Amino acid sequence: MKNNYTSLKSPIDEEDELKTDHEIDLEKGPLPEYDSEEESTLPPYSDHARLKNPPYTHREKNPSRSTDNSSPFLIKLLISFTSIILFNAPAVCYLKYKDAFFKNYGAAEWTLFGFWCLVCTLALISLTYFYETWTKAVKVTVISLAQCVKACGKGIKHFLKNWRNMIFAFCKSSLFCLVLLKAENELSSHLGDQQWGWKCSASAFTFMAVSSILIFIAETVEPGSCSTDLVKRVQAYCGYEARQYASSNTAIPLHEMNPENEA
């Protein structure tokens, strides 16, 4: 089958393409020879060539410029020394308060002081060398403590908001304790025996402590749960029993309602 393809380009367009092929880019320079048979070579000014040979950047001009943002050595040393001073400040203040700072030192005291200076020096070296590690640990600890304080503040606020009836709850529990103590004294004096009196006292105090705590919690969480609600429940129960009794007395028997069935 013959190829009947005919070019639609005019002779003028073909001359323009030949001119543009032979033009030289002033920025890129003349085109080097490209051998299409070699697979390893790439045509110049192509996208792959740009990826393999990235453009010259300003960062390559300064290869010695470091990107390390760590603190300088003197700042690390100063912060570590300040932390050691703050750690030793309470001991120095205590010695100043006792008026024993570098006074009447013997051989043992000077030996201990020298050992302590050695420990502080080693601590200073360690803190300076491991500066990033211990500062990060301090930051994490401070953040954790701040979160704990925030949580405790929310808990106290919730406690004060929901447990606002603490005074009345304390008064009710105290009144309950006084009544129970009076009953315990009467029972102990009535029994007379010391052994039984001691047992009654121990039982009464245990029951009083547990009951007062429960009453305090119940009255604080739900005010009136141990007094007002109890009275209301008793009144409701008594009213229910009265209604049941009245309904049972006023009920009409079936034979009175239907006398025809009886006949």
UniProtKB/Swiss-Prot annotation:
Keyword vocabulary terms for this entry: Membrane, Transmembrane, Transmembrane helix, Vacuole
UniProt GO cellular component terms: vacuolar membrane
Subcellular localization(s) per the UniProt record: Spore membrane; Vacuole membrane
Basic and acidic residues: bias regions: 19-30
UniProt-annotated stretches for the region Disordered: 1-68
Keyword Nucleus: no
Chief place where the protein resides: membrane
Domain of life of the source: Eukaryota
Ranges that cross the membrane: 73-93, 110-130, 201-221
Record-linked InterPro entries: WTF
GO biological process terms held by the UniProt record: meiotic drive
Bilayer topology term: Multi-pass membrane protein
UniProt keyword Transmembrane helix present: yes
Role according to the record: Acts as a suppressor component of the dual wtf meiotic drive system, and can suppress but not confer meiotic drive by compatible poisons. Wtf meiotic drive systems promote unequal transmission of alleles from the parental zygote to progeny spores by encoding a poison and an antidote from the same locus; the poison is trans-acting and forms toxic aggregates in all spores within an ascus, wherease the antidote is spore-specific and targets aggregates for degradation by the vacuole.
Family: Belongs to the WTF family.
Quaternary data: Homomer. Interacts with other proteins that exhibit high sequence similarity.
UniProt-recorded name of the protein: Meiotic drive suppressor wtf6
